[in-house]
Design a protein with these regions (language model features):
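Signature for the C-terminal beta-barrel architecture of outer-membrane proteins
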Residues: 134-142, 161-338, 380-385, 393-395, ...
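Predominantly the C-terminal beta-signal and adjacent terminal strand-loop region
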Residues: 431-473
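Flexible internal linker/loop segments at domain or repeat junctions
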Residues: 343-367, 398-413
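Conserved C-terminal beta-signal and adjacent last beta-strands/turns
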Residues: 127, 375, 388-389, 418-431, ...
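Small/polar (Gly/Ser/Thr/Ala-rich) solvent-exposed segments
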Residues: 147
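Outer-membrane beta-barrel signature, preferentially recognizing the C-terminal barrel domain
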Residues: 215-221, 352-376, 380
Length: 474
């Protein structure tokens, strides 16, 4: 019979348990949804009903994109409303529907605000979810979802449901999710990603209502397996296929780069914990065929060979404010001229705000033609608020390709590879815990030689950007 623990050992174990439970203890979504609408409807049995409303104001000065193609200075007042209803939550089959309403006002006619910000009144989710129980073994749980749905997988760098952006990726198809008794996870999916509509200037300015389109001309499929408890964290292996083709030549046709890609990758990650190191290492390769442009006359298939690497190491101090300092490195391949290959990395349907700064009217940095280390400092003083600041210098991986998401390019390569410095900060504060949260941030882009001297670089100064939004959960 084992000896009973001493008083000192018991105290030490209790302290360790409290420390483990104290991280993370800030969340940008309600820990307990207020269910205001559900309660107002009389709390109907077997239903789940919730929603959110997020107004945002943002502005950009000294545009980094080509001018006058895009406005040199711009503002956007956007609204994102969601309404989620699910029936059958106590049974083996659940029916779910979620409406998205993403609108924008007061932007310039040549604003960079596009379908990433505006998509009025869209049934983003409409699905059946089947509980398949312990199909994968004793102690496991699994489910099959069919219809329209949103999806987060792994790091969210390739497949995601956006959190900051004003519109949300959605897919039509099916997905199977499994979790074993040992906490291993498996996901497989075949989907048709939605093309958001309208996508013309007048339709966007009018917040026109037009249902999004899915078709066999754009398909995403693949699987991910995550091993639990590997080196104190998780290890994920995955592979995704993307098939894309033009949808004809008529008035409503969509011309594409005819991407036929296979994207395998791996990720080793450990979540932040107080008084410990954490890490996130991910390596992705991309192969297949694609065309250089979406022009209908471009019929030349290029061999794709692209890659992306992310490395991150952080440490959280055992202090009341839970300060975390982390070092990051991102390397995404860019394309070269006239080599018969296409080597620019494609992040598929991944999110980027959590790593590279605000998107919306801003968002110069993405996983394409990028070399960028970064340092980040975060604090989490309480469950009510958190904040961070980050510094990131920016280089091009290829001097002849477009830099990240800026649309700035020098095919000659004479503008160099240094794009500039980015400094950003963010503050989040629960005005009413679990019901209303404030989120505000600033970003400063000090332009380097490339963003100043490239042939289509705008004659503007350094870029300033700011936003303020509140989200009400009901």
């Amino acid at each position: 019979m084992p000896a009973a623990p001493t008083e000192k050992e018991t105290a030490r174990a209790s302290a360790a348990k409290a420390k483990a439970q104290s991280w993370p203890y800030f969340a940008a979504a309600p820990a307990q949804p207020p269910n205001v609408l559900y309660k107002a409807l009389g709390e109907p049995e077997n239903w789940r009903i919730s929603g959110s409303f997020r107004p945002r104001v943002e502005g950009i000065a000294n545009q980094f994109r080509p001018v006058p193609t895009f406005a040199a200075n711009d503002i956007l007042n956007s609204y994102l409303t969601t309404l989620y209803v699910e029936y059958g939550i106590k049974g083996p089959v659940r029916l779910g529907v979620e409406l998205f309403d993403s609108r924008g006002y007061f932007q310039q006619r040549n604003s960079s605000a596009f379908t990433t910000e505006i998509n009025a009144l869209e049934p983003g989710q409409a699905y059946l979810n089947f509980d398949t129980g312990d199909l994968g073994g004793d102690g496991s749980k699994s489910s099959l979802t069919v219809g329209r749905f949103t999806k987060n997988i792994g790091s969210r760098r390739l497949v995601s449901r956006q959190q900051f952006r004003n519109t949300i990726n959605a897919y039509t198809g099916l997905t199977y999710d499994w979790q074993g008794a040992n906490r291993d996870k498996f996901t497989a999916l075949w989907v048709m990603p939605h093309t958001r509509l309208p996508d013309d200037v007048n339709g966007l300015l009018d917040n026109g209502i037009e249902f999004d389109r899915e078709s066999l001309n754009l398909q995403l499929f693949g699987a991910s397996y995550t091993f639990a408890d590997i080196l104190g964290g998780t290890f994920e292996l995955y592979g995704y296929g993307l098939y894309e083709q033009d949808s004809g030549t008529g008035l409503r046709s969509v011309q594409t780069r005819d991407r036929r890609l296979f994207t395998p990758g791996m990720r080793l990650a450990r979540r932040p914990q107080v008084g410990a190191f954490d890490y996130d290492f991910e390596a992705i390769y991309q192969t297949g065929l694609a065309r250089e442009t979406a022009a209908a006359t471009d019929l030349r298939d290029l061999t794709v060979s692209a890659y992306f690497v992310h490395a991150e190491v952080g440490y959280t101090l055992d202090h009341a404010w839970k300060p975390r300092l982390s070092l990051h490195y991102d390397h995404a391949s860019g394309d070269r001229n006239n080599d018969g290959k296409f080597t620019r990395f494609d992040t598929l349907f991944g999110a980027r705000r959590f790593e590279y700064g605000p998107t919306g009217l801003y968002g110069p940095v993405q996983r394409a033609n990028l070399i960028s280390p970064s340092i980040r400092a975060e604090i989490t003083p309480s469950k009510v608020w958190d904040a961070f600041v980050a510094y990131r210098p920016l280089w091009l991986e290829s001097a002849t390709d477009t830099f990240a998401a800026t649309l700035i390019r020098d095919r000659s390569g004479r503008s160099g590879t240094f794009a500039g410095h980015q400094i950003e900060g963010r503050l989040r504060y629960w005005i009413i815990p679990n019901e209303m949260i404030l989120d505000t941030g600033l970003a400063y882009l000090a332009k380097g030689d490339f963003l100043r001297n490239a042939p289509n670089a705008p004659d503007t100064g350094d870029t300033f950007y700011g936003y303020l939004n509140t989200t009400l959960f009901f």
